[in-house]
Amino acid sequence: MKFAVIVLPGSNCDIDMFHAVKDELGEEVEYVWHEETSLDGFDGVLIPGGFSYGDYLRCGAIARFANIMPAVKKAAAEGKPVLGVCNGFQILQELGLLPGAMRRNKDLKFICRPVELIVQNGGTLFTSSYEKGQSITIPVAHGEGNFYCDDETLERLKENNQIAFTYGGDINGSVSGIAGVVNEKGNVLGMMPHPERAVDELLGSADGLTLFRSIVKNWRETHVATA
């Protein structure tokens, strides 16, 4: 399986994402600069965290206009796995690929520490190697990770089982404790916690590696079945 790690001005987690895929999983991965216009030849797309374009106007608001973004939307429409982490999640919201918006954390402080997540949906291509209800430890690093949506959208997320992860406690004020959501097709995931920073027990947790393994496992099963 071949992954693309999108690199934007201000990305700062692209190297961690690359390491998780290449060094921990042993899969193919390439950096793709934001000025590129095609993602043909890639099987999965990873949008890392950071502060794209300095978070000016609004987190992800300028990044949505990057040359590569139409190709990201095309990959999502084709059913390829697309993962956006932290700022990547915000960008996916700005692109309209995921619902909701991000507000400042409730205490207006930047949070940077390991947190407990609860797996709410173990049936997606990103979470199938977890158990529903499983408690995992993944670090967060954000100042604007307070997920917000209106009541109608929240009800739809619950009905469609689109809530992938919730926080084990109220760390930032997110509606219903939401930490990550998938689109209706289940091939686009946005999450504020950083799974790429939890791929080695030396760092305190390897729970994030399971997410990447899930992606690869599902891709291989699908492609072997259709070969």
Swiss-Prot record:
GO molecular function: ATP binding; glutaminase activity; phosphoribosylformylglycinamidine synthase activity
Start and end residues of each Glutamine amidotransferase type-1 domain: 3-225
Metabolic or biological pathway, per its Swiss-Prot or TrEMBL entry: Purine metabolism; IMP biosynthesis via de novo pathway; 5-amino-1-(5-phospho-D-ribosyl)imidazole from N(2)-formyl-N(1)-(5-phospho-D-ribosyl)glycinamide: step 1/2
Reaction it catalyzes: N(2)-formyl-N(1)-(5-phospho-beta-D-ribosyl)glycinamide + L-glutamine + ATP + H2O = 2-formamido-N(1)-(5-O-phospho-beta-D-ribosyl)acetamidine + L-glutamate + ADP + phosphate + H(+); L-glutamine + H2O = L-glutamate + NH4(+)
Xref: SUPFAM superfamilies: Class I glutamine amidotransferase-like
EC number: 6.3.5.3, 3.5.1.2
Keyword match Manganese: no
Main location: cytoplasm
The entry's keywords: ATP-binding, Cytoplasm, Glutamine amidotransferase, Hydrolase, Ligase, Nucleotide-binding, Purine biosynthesis
Compartments reported by the entry: Cytoplasm
Pfam families xref list: GATase_5
GO process annotations (BP): 'de novo' IMP biosynthetic process
GO cellular component assignments: cytoplasm
Active site, UniProt feature: C86 (nucleophile), H194, E196
InterPro entries: Class_I_gatase-like, PRibForGlyAmidine_synth_PurQ
Function as written in the Swiss-Prot or TrEMBL entry: Part of the phosphoribosylformylglycinamidine synthase complex involved in the purines biosynthetic pathway. Catalyzes the ATP-dependent conversion of formylglycinamide ribonucleotide (FGAR) and glutamine to yield formylglycinamidine ribonucleotide (FGAM) and glutamate. The FGAM synthase complex is composed of three subunits. PurQ produces an ammonia molecule by converting glutamine to glutamate. PurL transfers the ammonia molecule to FGAR to form FGAM in an ATP-dependent manner.
Subunit-level organization: Part of the FGAM synthase complex composed of 1 PurL, 1 PurQ and 2 PurS subunits.
Name used for this protein in its record: Phosphoribosylformylglycinamidine synthase subunit PurQ
Organism this protein belongs to: Bacillus velezensis (strain DSM 23117 / BGSC 10A6 / LMG 26770 / FZB42)
